[in-house]
Structures are given as structure tokens and as C-alpha cells.
A protein has these predicted regions:
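N-terminal catalytic scaffold of extracellular/periplasmic and nuclease hydrolases
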Residues: 1-132, 203, 228-307
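Active-site lining segments that contact anionic ligands and/or coordinate catalytic metals
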Residues: 139, 171-175, 218, 264-269
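Functional beta-strand-loop-alpha-helix junction segments that form "active/interaction loops"
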Residues: 126-160, 195
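Extended C-terminal subregions enriched in glycine
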Residues: 186, 191-244
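Gly-rich Lys/Arg/Thr-decorated short loops/hinges at beta-loop-alpha junctions or inter-strand turns
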Residues: 31-36, 137-150, 184-190, 276-281
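Active-site His/acidic residue clusters
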Residues: 73-79, 147-149, 160-164, 169-173, ...
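Short amphipathic alpha-helices and their capping/turn segments at secondary-structure boundaries
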Residues: 52-56, 130-134, 160-171
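Beta-strand elements within well-structured catalytic alpha/beta cores of enzymes
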Residues: 55, 173-181, 206, 220-226, ...
């Protein structure tokens, strides 16, 4: 990936257990820690302003693209407010009232059942990739597409470029959050090959975004994870004569791996930045080479000249 490396980030929340995706998305999207299962909200019920809210207030276009459903924890953390990440009706209503211009996720029965409500909220709605281009003239678009899994009919890289083309029509700029949500899902199930293929898909998406950027100097790309899952360790060991090799993407090589956990861990994750070299001098957010996950929000505020 053609990106510059920056400090590792810390995945935190208010309790002592490892963060869930709702709390970590809230931290990155709002700059505040909360408890697990809460989305865009403090433990006392206070609703938090997200980076999408800030961008909307500046007249910028906003968008979310995910291989998960739009009611998943990460997209919800950037666009909704509720005490429970599983409160689907509340999540959907909050998300549709968020003002986010583009909502794109994998097909979901709850979203499909609310197609009329989605359209009543002013969204151009489509369930076929062939119909995506037809929504470009609308101020708001809702794309429900087959994006899930390693054999997805629609590729995350392709739809991410469509999202960039849609949002970049706004001359005031845009903020777009893209999620490859299946690395986490496969690691939860200790499905190593699925996790590798999902990371490869993320890499292809990053490359597509970089190619789209070309020589542009007005767009910054941040790449990170909300947490690690499974305690995965991988090593390259000597080969033994009776080992069965697995060929992945035309490459046959022996790798040894182990999952040390069945859930999220507190392992620090990487942050990669293209377009700027940030000045990490705020000791409240950055200390000894580690940036708090809440610092992602404040970094984005700085990029929007809002801090």
C-alpha cells in the first residue's frame, strides 16, 4: 500500500474489558470513550456529535460504505445514537435522520423492509449495482448491495470508487468512511483464509482509492482498525516434507498461525496516513508512540480546520 506509516493507535473504551465495535467506532467518530454496546452516546445518554455531523455542518458531503449491513456497529457509530447496538429500529431511524448523504452496505432484510421509509426520508434507493449510477443526481442515496463475504457479487473497491465519484460532486468537499467489515467476522470464527482474503480485498480497495486520487492534493486518507480480533499470530517456519500446502491467489507458501482468543483483544492497531505528516504533540491524545483511538476524531477535526 502506498501510504506513510504513523503511530500505532490504542483501542480503548470506559470499562476494563476489550472494546467492542460500537464503543470503538464511537471513539473514532466522536472523540469520546463510552461503554460497550453504546453507539454515538455517553453512558448517561448524552448524544455525541460525530465527524459526519461536523462535516455536514460545514456544507460537505458525507458517506459511509461497508461490507457489513448499515445497521452494523461501525457504520452506526458514525451515523446514529442509541444505548444498544442491536436496537435495529432505533438505529435505522437515527441513521436516516443523520443527514449522511450516502449510505451503502450489504443487503439486509431489515433495511429492505424499510425501503419505503428510506425513500420517504429523501434517499434515492437501489438494491442493484446496475442502478447505482442512476442515483448520482440525488442529494442522498441509499445503496443496498451484495457486498458480504469473500465471494461477494459486488467488490468493495468498485463501490468505493462509485462513492468517491458521487460525493466529490460537492465542491465543498466530502468525508467518507469505508469499512471492510469481514476481517473481524472471519477472525471471530478463526477462519484464517477468509481473514486473509478480506485483508487482500481491503488492500485492493486502498489501491483503487489511491489510483482515484492521482495527483490530487486536496484529499487525505486515514487507514486504521477499530480493534484486533482473535489474538492472531502468524509466522513463517521451515517446511516439513509431509506438509500439505494451500495455494492462495496463486502463491504456495507454508505459514503457521494461531488464534489466541475468540473475541476482541486490547492489542494496539496500526494507523496509516496518506497526504499529510501530522504533528502528534497533544500529550492527552498521543503518548510514547501511541495515539488514543479518540485521537482519530481530533485528527479529522484538524484536517477540517475545526480545532
Amino acid at each position: 500500500m502506498s501510504i506513510d506509516t504513523a503511530p500505532i493507535t490504542y483501542s480503548g473504551q470506559l470499562s476494563t474489558e476489550a472494546t467492542d465495535s460500537a464503543a470503538s467506532a464511537t471513539a473514532m467518530a466522536t472523540g469520546h470513550l463510552t461503554v460497550n454496546k453504546y453507539v454515538g452516546m455517553l453512558p448517561d445518554g448524552t448524544e455525541l456529535e460525530t465527524i459526519m455531523d461536523v462535516a455536514n455542518g460545514l456544507g460537505k458531503a458525507t458517506g459511509i460504505v461497508t461490507t457489513d449491513t448499515l445497521l452494523g456497529a461501525t457504520p452506526s457509530g458514525f451515523s446514529a445514537h442509541t444505548r444498544s447496538r442491536t436496537a435495529e429500529k432505533v438505529l435505522m431511524e437515527s441513521q436516516l435522520n443523520s443527514g449522511v448523504n450516502l449510505l451503502c452496505g450489504t443487503q439486509d432484510s431489515v433495511c429492505t423492509a424499510n425501503a419505503k421509509n428510506i425513500q420517504d426520508k429523501g434517499y434515492a434507493y437501489c438494491e442493484s449495482y446496475a442502478d447505482v449510477a442512476g442515483t448520482f443526481s440525488s442529494d442522498k442515496a441509499y445503496w443496498q448491495l451484495p457486498l458480504a463475504g469473500t465471494d461477494a457479487e459486488v467488490d468493495l473497491a468498485d463501490v468505493s470508487i462509485d462513492a468517491l465519484n458521487y460525493l466529490s460532486q460537492d465542491e465543498d468537499g466530502f468525508v467518507l468512511m469505508i469499512e471492510q467489515g469481514h476481517v473481524d467476522k472471519y477472525c471471530h470464527n478463526h477462519e484464517f483464509l477468509g481473514a486473509i482474503q478480506s485483508v487482500s480485498n481491503l488492500n485492493s480497495t486502498v489501491e483503487a482509492v489511491m489510483n482515484w486520487l492521482g495527483d490530487r492534493t486536496d484529499t487525505i486518507v486515514l487507514i486504521t482498525a477499530d480493534h484486533e480480533t482473535g489474538g492472531l499470530q502468524v509466522s513463517d517456519q521451515p517446511e516439513y516434507p509431509n506438509e500439505e500446502k494451500v495455494t492462495v491467489d496463486g502463491v504456495s507458501k507454508t505459514l503457521y498461525y494461531i488464534f489466541n482468543a475468540g473475541a476482541h483483544t486490547s492489542t494496539n492497531v496500526g494507523l496509516f496516513i496518506h497526504g499529510i505528516t501530522p504533528d502528534f504533540t497533544d500529550s492527552d491524545l498521543y503518548n510514547e508512540g501511541v495515539l488514543k483511538n479518540t485521537g482519530i476524531f481530533y485528527l479529522m477535526l484538524d484536517l477540517l480546520n475545526m480545532r
